[in-house]
Regions:
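Core dinuclear metal-dependent hydrolase active-site scaffold
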Residues: 3-23, 131-149
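Core catalytic region of metal-dependent phosphoesterases/phosphodiesterases
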Residues: 25, 29-32, 37-132
């Protein structure tokens, strides 16, 4: 898996094969559309899907964190898939993952699924904000946001 170095808006970034973007100047790791609990939500709606997708996603995210050593993680929307995300199994996996990365500040820029699913539980210690989230002169959004001309 190869990463790609790019620059946009005067900001250097590393597009990672692990489905993340790393901004080295601010040591920020960006991800989007994590959809924790998606398989649990589908099973709750009687749609057959295998368990374990959240665990796979958490492991990939952990590897990106270990690889980059970020000062913060910013999730650009859709952290949670639906209100039914919070099964015992999913919450236990996410809680254990969060404990592994307890010192890492996490910011969630709410996306369309987050607005329906609600904010993550307080024990996960995730700061939730609306869009846009401004960082290094960039306006970060889940969906296209209005901008100044």
């Amino acid at each position: 898996m190869n990463d790609l170095a790019v620059s946009f808006g005067g900001v250097d970034a590393r597009l990672m094969a692990r489905r993340a973007i790393f901004l080295p100047a601010s040591r920020t790791l960006l991800v989007a559309d994590v959809h924790w609990g998606k398989s649990a939500a589908f099973r709750a709606a009687a749609i057959p899907v295998p368990p374990g997708t959240t665990s796979d996603d958490l492991e990939r995210l952990s590897k990106a964190i270990l690889e980059t050593g970020p000062a913060r993680l910013v999730i650009l929307g859709d952290l949670l898939h639906a209100k039914t995300w919070n099964t015992k199994r999913t919450h236990a996996a996410v809680s254990q993952w969060r404990q592994r990365h307890a010192r890492l500040p996490i910011v969630l820029v709410r996306g369309n699924h987050d607005l329906r699913a609600g904010d993550p539980t307080p024990d996960l210690d995730i700061e939730c904000v609306g869009q846009p989230f401004t960082l290094d002169g960039l306006k970060l959004c889940h969906q296209p946001c209005e901008h100044d001309n």
